[in-house]
């Protein structure tokens, strides 16, 4: 990928900053998400909660279903590919998807290698649970990073852990001397230029969203206050009692994340949140995929 194309892709991802990206399974849900103010939608045949419940191998969604969602909304549409499955990515690029998420939510196709994202024109989103993972994905050509969390649980604890971990490691890099950055880059297994960027700017070179377990407006505001630049909401909306109201409330929470009065108002009368699964009740399946 030409350097100027990558810069363009990073800028495209920056345009989603401060927004909410919602998992949708059909055109009707996509229209609900768009009406609620979503910045983009993620087209998925099965949302993470269902993938977790059913088990088995989960793959890229049917291109026909993705195209139906593309035709239903005017906001950007994303879709997921398996880690390392560059042919699934080629297919999504062929149907002119707006963003590709190389996702640990699906069953990995390759246990060692990720997709070479520089081979594609479409911007890629990747998950990371610490600074090393984030910078390695960026070195491969990712235009956007999100926390991995533990999708499909409705439990925010993993996303919080990953965001705090990333922030702590960024602060550690900032406190290093210039001549210590080379060793840090070697330890993180990334080009020194990326570590130098973090040292100078105190943040990732690409936009950084939160994902995994976000189920309430308060969850979304929590992740924003911890440093996220936007949020992904998967199972939390359409597994809840009142998806339309909850979707709108989460969008408002991301915009007003530092205003407790507004957060209190929009948290009222949302119907039942998704039941969720406590992290202590499950085996951590997805967050450990793709390091």
Curated annotation (Swiss-Prot):
Pathway of action: Cofactor biosynthesis; pyridoxal 5'-phosphate biosynthesis
Please name the source species: Haemophilus influenzae (strain ATCC 51907 / DSM 11121 / KW20 / Rd)
Key words of the record: Lyase, Pyridoxal phosphate, Schiff base
Q: What class of enzyme is it?
A: lyase
Which BP terms in the Gene Ontology apply to this protein? amino acid metabolic process; pyridoxal phosphate biosynthetic process; pyridoxine biosynthetic process
This protein is called Pyridoxal 5'-phosphate synthase subunit PdxS
Task: Summarize subunit and interaction data from the UniProt record for this chain.
Answer: In the presence of PdxT, forms a dodecamer of heterodimers.
What InterPro entries does the record point to? Aldolase_TIM, PdxS/SNZ, PdxS/SNZ_N, RibuloseP-bd_barrel
Record-linked Gene3D superfamilies: Aldolase class I
| SUPFAM superfamilies attached to this UniProt entry | Ribulose-phoshate binding barrel
Please give the PANTHER family that the UniProt record associates with this protein: PYRIDOXAL 5'-PHOSPHATE SYNTHASE SUBUNIT SNZ1-RELATED (PTHR31829:SF0)
Q: Which domain of life is it from?
A: Bacteria
């Amino acid at each position: 990928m030409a350097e100027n194309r990558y810069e363009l892709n990073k800028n495209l991802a920056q345009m989603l900053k401060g927004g909410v990206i919602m998992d949708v399974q059909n055109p009707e849900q996509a229209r609900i998400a768009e009406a609620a103010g979503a910045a983009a939608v993620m087209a998925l045949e099965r949302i993470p909660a269902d993938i977790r419940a059913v088990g088995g191998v989960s793959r890229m969604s049917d291109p026909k279903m993705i195209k139906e969602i593309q035709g239903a909304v005017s906001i950007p549409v994303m879709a997921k590919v398996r880690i390392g499955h560059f042919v699934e990515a080629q297919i999504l690029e062929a149907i002119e998807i707006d963003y590709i998420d190389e996702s640990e939510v699906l069953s990995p196709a390759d246990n060692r290698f990720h997709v070479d994202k520089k081979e594609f024109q479409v911007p890629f989103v990747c998950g990371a649970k610490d600074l090393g993972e984030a910078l390695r994905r960026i070195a491969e050509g990712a235009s956007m990073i999100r926390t991995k969390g533990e999708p499909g649980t409705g439990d925010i604890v993993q996303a919080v852990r990953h965001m705090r971990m990333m922030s702590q490691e960024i602060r550690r890099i900032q406190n290093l001397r210039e001549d210590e950055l080379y060793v840090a880059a070697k330890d993180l297994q990334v080009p020194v230029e990326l570590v130098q960027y973090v040292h100078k700017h105190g943040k990732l070179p690409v936009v950084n969203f939160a994902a995994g377990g976000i189920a309430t407006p308060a969850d979304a505001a929590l992740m924003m206050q911890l440093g996220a630049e936007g949020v992904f909401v998967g199972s939390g909306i359409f597994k809840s009692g009142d998806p339309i109201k909850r979707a709108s409330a989460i969008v408002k929470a991301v915009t007003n994340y530092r205003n407790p009065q507004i957060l209190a108002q929009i948290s009222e009368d949302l119907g039942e949140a998704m039941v969720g699964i406590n992290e202590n009740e499950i085996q951590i399946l997805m967050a450990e995929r793709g390091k």
